[in-house]
Amino acid sequence: MRVTLSAAVTADGYMDDDSPRRLIISTPGDWEEVYRLRAAHDAILAGAEPLRRDDPSLLVRDQAARARRVQAGLKPDIAKVTLTRSGGLSPRLRFFTAGDADRYVFSPGEITGLQNVATVISTSEAITAKYIVTELEKRG
């Protein structure tokens, strides 16, 4: 499995600030590249806090890319993955409701309330990048 890390950061190394507003760093051209990369991958991971704050859908937006995925025998949207300690995510978030994608929630302990909208993977092991990739590979 190939993994790509994509993150927008400010010139001084920040990904966000501590205000309740979303910090916009990316340009429209950046977003075009993000969407192109997204369509070529199997999964996208977003932390629980960005899900709470921004409510992203994390969909493949380009209709031609969606059609290519379906033609290749894939779902039109890539799998969505998140990490949470608390499980404090609303099942009404677009992460869970938008698109035709498999959804995975990783947690270091048992959580309830999301089993009807995602595959919940709870573990007492450390949740490392290797652990996440291994678990996703097991599930296709």
Where in the sequence are the language-model features?
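Active-site ligand-binding patch in enzyme domains
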Residues: R2-R139
